[in-house]
């Protein structure tokens, strides 16, 4: 594994939690600027979710929800990953996504579910975030 020390290696990629609170778009830009090819994290296998959840629980300082790279760009429940990978795995929290009040188009890991399940949230909300990179 070629991941730097405080990054989580998984399936050829490296993941890191950042505790700085940012709006979703600013978090995605931060990941992209960190290193070319980095994005907010995308998930594709059931097995990735618990491993990442455990990593976040161990390293996340604070109670904030955590942005991942899923969003509803067209605002019609057609969810897309910022790294343009295939949306083949979704693990929503109960009664989600709901586009509550027609305002929630970005996806966060819910702290009350141990960061295992997802919720759609207002993109301007300030959250911690999870970057995914190749090193």
Curated annotation (Swiss-Prot):
Q: Which GO terms describe its cellular component?
A: extracellular region
User: Found in which tissues?
Assistant: Expressed by the venom gland.
UniProt motif Galactose-binding: location: 96-98
Question: What transmembrane ranges does the database entry give?
Answer: none
Which residues make up the binding site for Ca(2+)?
96, 98, 104, 119-120
Function, as annotated, reads:
Lectin that shows calcium-dependent hemagglutination activity but does not induce platelet aggregation in the presence or absence of calcium ions and vWF. Does not inhibit platelet aggregation induced by botrocetin and vWF.
**Family note:** Belongs to the true venom lectin family.
The record describes its quaternary structure and partners as: Homodimer; disulfide-linked.
Query: This protein is called what?
Result: C-type lectin BjL
Q: Which organism is it from?
A: Bothrops jararaca (Jararaca)
């Amino acid at each position: 594994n070629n991941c730097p020390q405080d990054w989580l290696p998984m399936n050829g990629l490296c993941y890191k939690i950042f505790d700085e609170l940012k709006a979703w778009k600013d978090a995605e830009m931060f990941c992209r600027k960190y290193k070319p090819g980095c994005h907010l994290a995308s998930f594709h296998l059931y097995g990735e979710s618990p491993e990442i959840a455990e990593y976040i629980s161990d390293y996340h300082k604070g109670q904030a929800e955590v942005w991942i790279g899923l969003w509803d760009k067209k605002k019609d429940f057609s969810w897309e990953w910022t790294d343009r990978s295939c949306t083949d795995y979704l693990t929503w929290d109960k009664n989600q996504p709901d586009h509550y009040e027609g305002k929630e188009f970005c996806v966060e890991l819910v702290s009350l579910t141990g960061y295992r399940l997802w919720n759609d949230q207002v993109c301007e909300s300030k959250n911690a975030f999870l970057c995914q990179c190749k090193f």
